[in-house]
């Protein structure tokens, strides 16, 4: 049996752009993708802290070091520039691997620059 776990997340990233006319996806600064172990075209869940929207999309690379977090296509209607979002990736693990797996949690500042990376999440800690 397999179990789906959070593989990584980028916590409280600031939306820099929402581009309705693009084909679709979320564009993420390549530095953030690397830090969170998220691949191009990987499916992610996006949670908007400002309005409560949750949706899935796929990732495309943004310019390294730019801080870019841009929602494209239909997803652009679900967020606004300046919103704080959480970008979550998931992995499928067998139960033995799941017992020892440690996710990556990437914390960013208001300009989407990495300020900390942790391998666990505890209630009440940011």
Curated annotation (Swiss-Prot):
Example of a GO cellular component annotation carried by this entry: cytosol
GO MF annotations in UniProt: aspartate 1-decarboxylase activity
Catalysed reactions, semicolon-separated: L-aspartate + H(+) = beta-alanine + CO2
Modified positions (Pyruvic acid (Ser)) in chain numbering: 25
Keyword set, alphabetical order: Autocatalytic cleavage, Cytoplasm, Decarboxylase, Lyase, Pantothenate biosynthesis, Pyruvate, Schiff base, Zymogen
Pfam families in alphabetical order: Asp_decarbox (PF02261)
EC number: 4.1.1.11
Binding site for substrate: 57, 73-75
Catalytic residues identified in the record: 25, 58
Subcellular location: Cytoplasm
Cofactor annotation comment: Binds 1 pyruvoyl group covalently per subunit.
Record GO biological process: alanine biosynthetic process; pantothenate biosynthetic process
Keyword Lyase: yes
Main location: cytoplasm
Pathways involved: Cofactor biosynthesis; (R)-pantothenate biosynthesis; beta-alanine from L-aspartate: step 1/1
Annotated TM spans: none
InterPro entries on file: Asp_de-COase-like_dom_sf, Asp_decarbox
Post-translational events: Is synthesized initially as an inactive proenzyme, which is activated by self-cleavage at a specific serine bond to produce a beta-subunit with a hydroxyl group at its C-terminus and an alpha-subunit with a pyruvoyl group at its N-terminus.
Cofactor: pyruvate
Family: Belongs to the PanD family.
Binding partners and assembly: Heterooctamer of four alpha and four beta subunits.
Entry protein name: Aspartate 1-decarboxylase
Naturally occurring in which organism (per UniProt): Acetivibrio thermocellus (strain ATCC 27405 / DSM 1237 / JCM 9322 / NBRC 103400 / NCIMB 10682 / NRRL B-4536 / VPI 7372) (Clostridium thermocellum)
Encoding gene (name): panD
């Amino acid at each position: 049996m397999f179990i789906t776990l959070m593989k990584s997340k980028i916590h409280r990233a600031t939306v820099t752009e929402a581009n309705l006319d693009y084909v679709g996806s979320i564009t993420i600064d390549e530095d953030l993708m690397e830090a969170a172990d998220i691949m191009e075209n990987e499916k992610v869940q996006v949670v908007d802290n400002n309005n409560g929207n949750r949706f899935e999309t796929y990732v495309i690379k943004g310019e390294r070091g730019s801080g870019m977090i841009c929602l494209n296509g239909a997803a652009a209607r679900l967020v606004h520039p300046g919103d704080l979002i959480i970008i979550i990736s998931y992995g499928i693990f067998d139960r033995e691997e799941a017992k020892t797996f440690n996710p990556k949690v990437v914390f960013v500042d208001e300009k989407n620059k990495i300020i900390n990376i942790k391998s666990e999440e505890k209630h009440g800690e940011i």
